[in-house]
Amino acid sequence: MAAPGTQALRGPRPRTAPLLALAAALILLGALMRAPVLFAYQGPWTAHALDVHLMAHAGAYSDISHLFLRDHLGEHPMPYFDFRFEYPALTGLFVWVASFAHTSVAAYFLTSTGLLLCLALVTVWALRRIDGANPWLFAATPALALYGTLNWDLLGICLLVIAMLLFQRGRN
């Protein structure tokens, strides 16, 4: 809980809608940096060939599309059981569930973007409820556009912020 009188120094809590709108816009901007290049790709569907194409365009590379091809996620293999996966276990489950959306890399990227957008919005919602937190520092950071759809780190960030909120409320 914040020290007495510090809320007056910070001012009133920001309204949630502008924070959510800004975070959503940044995530969608990140997807817009990557999706057109991904959809325009006409080369061989291998991780290396796609990476060469994506890296020729600033901001277009994403682990999401790379690992879809590298790990054959369109065939829905189970991370850690069917192939080695370098991300934490809950991320592996997230990646596996998202793989059932479609068998194309573009559809998988868009599905993952939608799920990551939901995680970003939940993170903003939780940050807004933590005493002393400044949710603008998350919702307005340009890094959200650059890294929000780079990989699945928003899952861990969202879970951490929810844990902090629950801890503050005494639900540890």
Protein language model annotation of sequence segments:
Residues 148-156:
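Short acidic/glycine- and proline-prone juxtamembrane loop motifs at membrane-interface regions
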Residues 124-144, 158:
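Transmembrane-helix signature of polytopic, membrane-embedded enzymes
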